[in-house]
Amino acid sequence: MNHDSKITPIMQQYMMLKSQYKEYLLFYRLGDFYELFFDDAIETSRILNIVLTKKGNVPMCGVPFHSSESYLNRLVKLGYKIAICEQLETSEEAKKRGYKALVKRDVVRIVTPGTILEDSLLEAKENNYLSCIVNVDHNYAIAWLELSTGLFYYHTTELHKLDSDLFRINPKEVLISDKLVELDSIYSILRKYKFSVTQYSGSFFDVSRSYNTLCNVYGISTLKGLGDLKNEEIAVCGSLLEYVKATQKGNLPQLEFPKAYSKGDFMFIDAAALRNLELFCTQSGDLEGSLISSIDYTITACGGRLLKRCLSAPLACSHAINRRLDIVEFFVNDRTLCRGVRETLRGIADIERILTRIKVGKCSPKDLYALKLTLDKIFVLLDLLHKFDSSVVGDFCSRLGKYDDLCKTLDDVLIPNNVNNVKDGGFINPDYDAQLSEYIYIQSYSNDLIQELRDKYRNITNIQSLKILYNNILGYYVEVSSSYLISDKDFIHRQTLANSIRYTTSELKALESKIISARDAAINLEVKIFGQLCTCIIEVADKITMTAHAIAEIDMLTSFAELAIQYSYTKPIVDDSYEFNIKKGRHPVVERNGKFVANDIDLSLMQRVHLITGPNMAGKSTFLRQNALIGILAHIGSFVPAQHAHIGVIDKVFSRVGASDNIASGHSTFMVEMTETAAIINQATDKSFVILDEIGRGTGTYDGLSIAWSVIEQIHNVNKSRAIFATHYHELSKLDRYLENIKCFCMKVEEWNGKVVFLHEIIPGSTNKSYGIHVAKLAGFPQSVLDRAEDLMSKLKANEDLLT
C-alpha cells in the first residue's frame, strides 16, 4: 500500500535523499540539529549512546549542529561513512517561493575515513591517506592522496608487494574493485590491516573514464605533461579523483599533480621488516617503544608528518641523504641557532591543512588568524637564518618566502579571535571598513543613539517629557502626553490613546532599521570581507605550500639535531660503497631503558655475512634490529647512535625476526617464516641489508638445519647482500670454512659459581651452548622442573634412555 499521503513533506524529502545514499548514515539538517531516522537512527544511537526517540512509528535521534564534529569523529573512526545533508536556504527564503514551500536540502558532502578535512577529526602528525588499487591487463598500480594537504602519489606494483605497500602507506580508506577483493591474497591483506574498504564495480576503474577525469580535474587537454603514464597508472589516479569528486560533491581541494613514487629513489622496507623493526608501533600495537616514539622531536604537525613519511620510505640516493646530514650537522654545530629555530617553530599552525580548508571554503576565522600568526613567525625565522652565510640556510630562506603585503592585510583586517564559525562575526577589525564600523557602533551604542535622538526631539518640540519607546507592534515611536500636540510636519501621527499620542519620524524609522538590521548587516559584511581575504590567500597558495614544506623540513632536521645532541649520535658516512661498518653501535630504543652495551659490526665485502650464535636472552635479536635501525636512520638523514658509522647506500631492508601465526590467513608460524624468507631470497640484491633470526626453528631439527644452511648459501652466493644471521644451530658455524665472505660471531657469556651472566657483547667465534635451562630459571620455572630438566639433559648428552 502506498503510504505517501500519510508522510509529511519533510519525511518525503528525507526518504528521497536516503534512497540515493543507502550505504551511508544520512545526517539530515533540521534547524540547529542533524537528525537521523529509521535504521540510521537505531544504529547511530547505539554507537554514540544518544537517546533514541520516536515520532509516530519513526525512530529518530539527533546531534547538535555546533557539536557535530565530535560525533562524526567517533563514527568515522569506526569506519562509518556519513552523507551530510544541509539546508540550502532559510525558511524566509523558502516562504518567498510559496507559503507552504519546503526548505531546499541536499547532500553537500560525504565524509569517509579517507576524505576528512576537519582539523578536529585529523591526527596532527599523521597523514590521512585515501588509497586506490587497480589491476589493468594483469598489471597492478596503487595510488594514494591526502585531501587535507594535497599530496598525491602513485606507482606500479605487484601482487606480492601490496602487503608492504599498504603497510608503508597506512591508508585510512582503500578504494578497490569488487573483483579484486574476491582474490584471497588481497582479501587477507585488507582483513589483516582492517582498512575501511570502499568497493565499486570494474567499470568505475575504466581507463578512458579515468583519463577524462584527470584532464577535467587539472584543466588540461592531455596527460603527456604528467609523463609516460601506463594504463594502470591512469586508471588508479583517475579513479581516485572520481571518488573524491563524488564525496566532495565537485568541491575539490587543490590537489598536487600526481607524482610517480620512484622506487629507485627510496629504500624498500618490506612489510615483515616494518613490523619486526617496530618502526611505527610495537608488536602489540603500542606507540610507546617504537622507533618513531624515540626519535620524534618534531614540534609542528607538518614536521611530524614529514618524519613519518621519510621513515616509511627512507632515501636511497647518497647525494640526497648527505644534503640532509649536512643540514643536521650545521644545526648540531650551532646549538644556539638550533634552539632559536626550534623555539620559533612552537606555535606554528598546520598551514598545509589550513590552506586546503581555505581552498574548499571550509575554513574558519580562527584558521585565518592562525595563518597570520604563522606568517609572522616566518619573519622571525628569516631573521635567525639570514645571519648565516651558508648555502644550507640560503635554500631555506628562499623557500620560506616573504609575505609583507599579505601580512599587512591580515594585520589590518583581523583582530585576535578564536571564532570557529564565520557567521558568528566579531573577527574583522571595525576600523578596516567604515560601513562595518558604523554597524558595530550602532549595535554597541543603540541605546545611546535613541537617547540622543530623544534629546534632539525634546529641543525641537520644547516638550521635556517626550519619550522614545519600543513595542513589537509599532517598533520605535515618539510618545508625548495627550495635552501636547506636535505640529512639526516631520512627526507623523501613529496612534492616539487616552493619555498619550504616539508619533514616528523618517529619522527614527531609519535608526530603527539600522539597529534591527545592524547585526545581520555586520555579519554579512564580515563574511564578504572574509571571502576577500581567502581569495588573497588563494592567490599565493602555491607559495604558502612551498613555505609549509620548508617549515616541515626545518622542523624535522632540527629535531634530528636535537636528537643527536641529547643522545650523542654521530654523523654517518653514507656513500655508494658496499660498506656497513659501525663502531660502538647502540639500539636507539632499547638504550633509553638504562645501561646499554655498545657493539661493533663490519659487513664489508670480504665479510658481508655474519653468523651469530648464542643463547636466548643474550642479545642476538637486539643486535640484529639495532643495525637495521642504524641503517634506516642514516638513510632518512639522521645522525645515528654509534661512535662511528660508514654505510653504503642500502636499496632494500628485509627482516625475518620473531615468530607468529597468521591465523587470519590460515598460516602457521612455520609457514609465515618460510613465506617471509622466500620474499627475501627472491628480492634481495647486493645493495640490500638482511637480518634473519632463527630460520628453520619451526620444523624438525634436520629440516630446519638444512633450510637454514641453504638460505645462507643463497644469500652469500646469489643475493650477495649484507646480512646478519642469528641461529641456535651451531653446526652452521662450519660454513665459514668454505664460504669466503662469511664470518662467525657469538654472544659473550660468563659462568661463575654456577651462575650464567649474559654480557650482551659480540665477540668473534661461535658457541654450542644455549643455556636454555638458565633462561627457564629466569622465567620463574619451579625448581623441581629445572632439576628434572638438568637430569634429562645429562642423559641426552650421554645417549642414555630418557625413560630409565
Swiss-Prot record:
Q: Which GO terms describe its biological process?
A: mismatch repair
Q: Which Gene3D superfamilies does this UniProt record tie to the protein?
A: 1.10.1420.10, DNA repair protein MutS, domain I, MutS, connector domain, P-loop containing nucleotide triphosphate hydrolases
Q: Which GO terms describe its molecular function?
A: ATP binding; ATP-dependent DNA damage sensor activity; damaged DNA binding; mismatched DNA binding
Q: Which keywords does this Swiss-Prot/TrEMBL entry list?
A: ATP-binding, DNA damage, DNA repair, DNA-binding, Nucleotide-binding
Keyword match DNA-binding: yes
Cited Pfam families: MutS_I, MutS_II, MutS_III, MutS_IV, MutS_V
Task: Tell me which residues bind ATP.
Answer: 614-621
* The protein's role, per its UniProt record: This protein is involved in the repair of mismatches in DNA. It is possible that it carries out the mismatch recognition step. This protein has a weak ATPase activity.
Family per UniProt?
A: Belongs to the DNA mismatch repair MutS family.
**Annotated NCBIfam families:** mutS1, PRK05399.1
The identity of this protein, by name, is DNA mismatch repair protein MutS
Source organism: Ehrlichia chaffeensis (strain ATCC CRL-10679 / Arkansas)
Q: Give the gene symbol.
A: mutS
